[in-house]
């Protein structure tokens, strides 16, 4: 791919962005720089420092290779902008160009981390002192200090600016305007060195790499180049690059926005239409179902036989009415809160692919693979190769009972031969940890003190043998924070339990039931029923009931260790049942 080299006047590019001749490809990320970022950019320009290279593409305005969008704010400020079609696309340099556009043309939208538009100024006194670090500042257009600089018609009051020694960046929108204002009002006040700083901005030349018109009909090559150079700054995802590649075949952004708005389960899972991980999952699933590689470098090369309006609509329907319907069913996968308790996103991508390929897949086998993946931490780290391997093996298994996937067989053997343990699982972010809680949620667990009508998403993970109780007894067992000593209960209940002994809070649980009119035996059985949903059987119940403050440190630790052993055995039996 041949690139020509040139230098472009930066303010000329900004002016052409205002006029509509310079635009962005619609796969570019949103403008995300803060006002502090913009201030730092202006300081660099004042000192004529290198701010990086721009990559632009010259395009046929009548037949652009990608969808085009104007620099944010340009349409608001220039109502005639649509009379000119873009001839140049900025492929790399959007944040810098948009930042300078914002500072010089002052559009009325807030920047990142702000709620009001800001105006940018140069403190000329600081330039006199060569204090570049403090020479640029910004004011909210809603603040009193900014409004005090304006005339009644909202133009700047030159006399007030001279008094404050402030120079608005908007005076640089036109070189003739700048020279007229400078020589009429400021040149006699400030030395030539200050003018030279300002002149650095006016004449700043940015190194530019140019893709000529010959690439107008080669968008796929442009996308590949963009992926290669897109290593720093606001990194584009493979999804953004796919949006660019498929511009003429399918409007992915519009399709995703439509799917997000019209499908409640998809909306609940994604959370935000700006989060493009979900539509990327959809595309991965389409590629997987056709036996294609889903590595990002390969996925951006798929063609419209894989991704088109029909295939997109199908994967959206499967996601909403088959996969997410199951994922949100707590009795099936125990995911009480999709943001907190979903073990892996790749498993959902895989499920989409199974439904795409098999229409009605053997869910018994799919579920065996699912739980095996969760409890073997199959998709931690790099995932694409493992997903491709597992999809192939599970698909073969669906059609041939004898071809059991390696991930299922290996976990089964580990558990059966005692080579698998959950004791050291402590990180709430791990799939094993979440998987244990998923199993508990599948049981529809009840809170210890308030067992009736509890929304599962309100339950949080807390210690069964209270950590404070064990520490007060001088016990620093390595399994105190193990998932085997955790279960979901209400925060309110956890605070009431606090540092109490297990015996004491179990007795309180029994009393709560007796206060509802149950006999002693009935109350005990009700508490056993509550605890059963938390993988706490009768033997473990007795351990909890008999672990009180009167026991020695060694006796308490012995009870704790026995409890952990029994609970692990019970949970592993459940896992084995799910995958066998």
Swiss-Prot record:
Domain of life per record: Archaea
Pfam family, one: GmrSD_N
The protein, known as: Uncharacterized protein MJ0686
Provenance organism: Methanocaldococcus jannaschii (strain ATCC 43067 / DSM 2661 / JAL-1 / JCM 10045 / NBRC 100440) (Methanococcus jannaschii)
Lineage summary: Archaea, Methanobacteriati, Methanobacteriota, Methanomada group, Methanococci
């Amino acid at each position: 791919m041949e690139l020509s080299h040139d230098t472009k006047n930066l303010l000329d590019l900004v002016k052409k962005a205002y006029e509509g001749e310079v635009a962005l490809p619609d796969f570019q990320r949103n403008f995300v720089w803060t006002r502090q970022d913009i201030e730092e950019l202006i300081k660099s320009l004042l000192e004529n420092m290198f701010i990086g290279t721009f990559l632009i593409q010259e395009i046929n305005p009548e037949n652009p290779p990608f969808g085009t969008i104007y620099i944010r704010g340009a349409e608001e400020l220039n109502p005639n902008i649509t009379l000119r079609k873009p001839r140049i696309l900025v492929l790399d340099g959007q944040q810098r160009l948009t930042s300078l556009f914002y500072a010089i043309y002052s559009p009325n939208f807030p920047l990142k981390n702000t709620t009001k538009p800001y105006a940018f100024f140069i403190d000329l006194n600081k330039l006199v002192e060569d204090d570049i670090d403090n020479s640029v500042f910004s004011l909210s257009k809603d603040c009193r200090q900014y409004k005090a600089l304006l005339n009644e018609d909202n133009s700047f009051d030159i006399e007030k600016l001279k008094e404050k020694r402030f120079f608005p960046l908007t005076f640089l929108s036109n070189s003739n305007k700048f020279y007229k204002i400078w020589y009429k009002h400021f040149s006699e006040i400030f030395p030539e060195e200050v003018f030279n700083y300002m002149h650095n901005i006016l004449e700043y030349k940015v190194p530019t790499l140019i893709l000529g018109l010959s690439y107008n009909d080669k968008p796929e090559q442009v996308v590949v180049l963009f992926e290669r150079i897109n290593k720093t700054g606001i990194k584009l995802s493979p999804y953004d690059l796919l949006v660019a590649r498929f511009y003429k075949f399918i409007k992915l952004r519009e399709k995703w926005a439509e799917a997000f708005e019209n499908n409640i389960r998809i909306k609940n899972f994604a959370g935000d239409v700006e989060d493009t991980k979900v539509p990327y999952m959809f595309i991965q699933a389409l590629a997987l179902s056709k036996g294609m590689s889903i590595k990002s470098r390969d996925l951006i090369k798929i063609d419209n036989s894989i991704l088109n309006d029909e295939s997109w609509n199908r994967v959206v329907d499967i996601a909403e009415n088959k996969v997410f319907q199951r994922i949100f069913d707590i009795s099936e996968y125990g995911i009480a809160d999709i943001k907190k308790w979903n073990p892996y996103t790749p498993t959902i991508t895989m499920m989409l692919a199974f439904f795409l390929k098999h229409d009605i897949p053997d869910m018994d086998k799919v579920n065996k693979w699912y739980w095996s993946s969760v409890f073997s931490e199959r998709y931690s780290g790099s995932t694409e190769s493992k997903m491709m391997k597992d999809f192939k093996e599970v698909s073969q298994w669906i059609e041939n009972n004898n071809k059991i996937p390696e991930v299922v067989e290996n976990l089964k053997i580990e558990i059966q031969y005692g080579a698998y343990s959950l004791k050291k699982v402590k990180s709430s972010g791990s799939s094993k940890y979440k998987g244990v809680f998923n199993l508990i949620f599948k049981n529809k667990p009840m809170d210890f003190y308030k067992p009736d009508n509890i929304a599962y998403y309100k339950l949080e993970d807390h210690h069964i043998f209270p950590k404070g109780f064990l520490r007060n007894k001088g016990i620093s067992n390595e399994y105190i924070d193990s998932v085997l000593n955790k279960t979901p209960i209400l925060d309110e209940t956890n605070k009431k339990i606090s540092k109490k002994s297990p015996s004491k809070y179990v007795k309180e649980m029994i009393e709560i039931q007796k206060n509802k009119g149950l006999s002693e035996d009935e109350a005990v059985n009700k508490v056993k029923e509550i605890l059963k949903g938390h993988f706490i059987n009768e033997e473990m119940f007795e351990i909890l009931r008999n672990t009180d403050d009167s026991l020695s440190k060694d006796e308490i630790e012995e009870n704790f260790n026995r409890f952990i052993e029994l609970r692990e055995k019970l949970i592993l039996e459940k896992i084995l049942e799910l995958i066998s």
